[in-house]
């Protein structure tokens, strides 16, 4: 009999809480922004549970209700900012009260309160953010270019020798992962079979599943966390504890080994070594916190860059004219005697346009980032209560027909006259002229924008310079149409699809071979102390 009552408890507790809230209702709530009507008790929970549909739905709601609208999930309020001006006025100009995070019990437990992206706005968040800024500012980010140059040369060689038309999906992830691991820890990830690569994939998979909107009931109804037995809510605590244990063991093993190497004087040059030497002395933080701070770079640098690069390839297959446009520009500016370099960027507006258009066309996540208010506020006559989740609705902004002609079409020429970097575009006075919002807004904007910009540019420029790209064919010669669906989880990473890469000429293929051979002989020029972790060495680093 007692067991039979368990399913009733969550509903009963929720109803009691709702009755209490209605009894003490704030009259200012009459001035909430307009929005779609929800169901009793659960509000818009069912509408928002399917993240794949939310991309279109959030745009449709913005069209119907305007630049700011309201949804509700259980007792939790969300306000969606669907215009550049609304984002600027609230997230940018009022960052002191629009920079926290909505309550997310699952995400918090998976991270044990250590992941920077999900920390509430406060002293701990500011301390870690300031430490990371030293590694991610414009000047410091430029010192990482030798790493990105080296890894992109290997990626070209890997694609040239790929065993099938699917392998590029993983090659792009290896490139992204090895780049950010070298920057962060001074450890390369040279192969897809490398133990460290498998460890990072494990963490990325946990992170993506834990943060998938609508995946965890407890994150949609946080007030049930300490009320309802977890076995009625997907055993979320057990899952979160298991994932945190695995993730923290990997991160702490990497961190502790580097600290030991620093003491012995054998540590490679990397961001974390500099952080330990300088910033941690001034702002001491716990080892676990430092390890997860480094992990924040790895998760973002691996996941988001992979997503963008695979979306570039998808765009090539859906809109083959962009390949022709890129080839024409590269042949004119670079020629066939060498591959593109960072110094070519000012003369490659079409390539820059491909990078920017990719991030507008398919932003990195299925739903824009949610901040949270720490005080009551008003905007254009609308009341925004303290504790409200405030979503940067980038799908409404990026797909706005008034700003972008045929917005669902991939068109790099939109940016041919745009000479600003993403960081410069974020800071310009007129928010309506910003290139895209994929790097966020306000005090929680992406601190790695400079590294991301460089990683995308050099890879995109060289991939287009080196290869023709076509839709693959099956054994009968039938063309295989690529899927536009996304993988499960928070990110808008496309499901794996085939693409046929072919070197543009024997000369291009020879240059790829020669440059990669030279790169291996030379090492990463300008990256002193770099070492490549061997499988044997990494077994001492890996937790498993």
Curated annotation (Swiss-Prot):
Under the heading PROSITE patterns, the entry gives: CYTOCHROME_P450
On whether Zinc is a keyword of this UniProt record, the answer is no
Q: Give, as one word, the top-level EC class.
A: oxidoreductase
Pfam families, alphabetized? p450
Bilayer-crossing regions = 3-23
As for subcellular location, the record says: Membrane
Q: What main location does UniProt list?
A: membrane
Might you give the EC number(s) for this enzyme? 1.-.-.-
The residues that hold heme are: 446
Q: One GO molecular function term?
A: heme binding
Q: Which cofactor does it need?
A: heme
GO terms under cellular component: membrane
The record's similarity note reads:
Belongs to the cytochrome P450 family.
UniProt function note: Cytochrome P450 monooxygenase; part of the gene cluster that mediates the biosynthesis of 11'-deoxyverticillin A, one of the dimeric epipolythiodioxopiperazines (ETPs) from the verticillin family that act as mycotoxins. 11'-deoxyverticillin A is required for normal conidiation. The nonribosomal peptide synthetase verP is speculated to be responsible for condensation of amino acids to form the carbon skeleton of verticillin, whereas the cluster-specific tailoring enzymes are involved in further modifications leading to the production of 11'-deoxyverticillin A.
Mind telling me what this protein is named?
Cytochrome P450 monooxygenase verL
Organism expressing this protein natively? Clonostachys rogersoniana
Give the gene name. verL
